[in-house]
Amino acid sequence: MIGIRGAIASVENSEDSILESSKILFNTLLEKNNLSVTKIVSVIFTVTKDLNTAFPAKAIRDLGYDKISALDTLAPDVDGDLLGCIRILVIYEDQFDPNHVYLGEAKDLRPDR
């Protein structure tokens, strides 16, 4: 089992923006890692405290993946953290060297990626 990480910065604190950003992040992570949805054990999203108008996990259900267990939680409030940030952790049943996905302004979170 492995964990595949990623992050994206939401353009604004609106339901549409949060859900669209979450869909982009999840789909990009699927594509970059050639993931089979049936091997996804669970997905955890975190959001910074300024994003309070939608649950990112709803994006997965909106994409039709209603059998995936998904959870939303609030990220720690750390000084200097990127605002409007949605992070993801996909727990996946396989072993390989994953491609973690950091998009937009979130690329600065992991300059090694």
Explain the meaning of each model-derived region.
Residues 1-113:
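Terminal domain-initiation and capping elements
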